[in-house]
Amino acid sequence: MMLDANQAWTASEAISRTRMLEPFWPYWMEEPLISDDVLGHSRVRQALYTAIAIGENIHSKFEMATYIHSGAVDIVQADAIRMGGITEWLKVAHMADAFNLKVAPHFLLELSGSLLCGVPNALILEDVEGGSLGDLGLLEETMTVEKGLWKPSHRPGHGILFNRDALDNTKVRA
């Protein structure tokens, strides 16, 4: 059971509510507090047996470093799109690995799956319905999940083959 509070609680609420669920051994509690409350997350993490997952609303390696150094996170859920791209995501994943933390990236199955293939501390790939490039109709060829395993592309790099016509339809005039 993986729980997500979507930044809804105070530290005290997160501790008391998660403690009520701990007899059921939840795997993690995701985003229990607003994302800029590093000290609160640290307090929550120290008070619980349940792992704390955070990262989808953290936007740089510097913000994530603060979480990691403060002992405020167990599972890093960095989002390559929100964090500044592939290079920034990889820096965060390797920083997490240096502190023996696993990564479970947020959003965009196709890109996140490829990134997980390149790091030693990969944990799990999230598949949000409606939140993949394939679901958005932006791919020539969708990537598949079979028996719970994501199948990476045989193409080099991230392996994503975009549908150029679909991308043209997303242009915005500035």
Which residues does each PLM region occupy?
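Flexible C-terminal active-site loop/helix
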Residues: 106-174
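Catalytic core of soluble alpha/beta enzymes
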Residues: 1-106
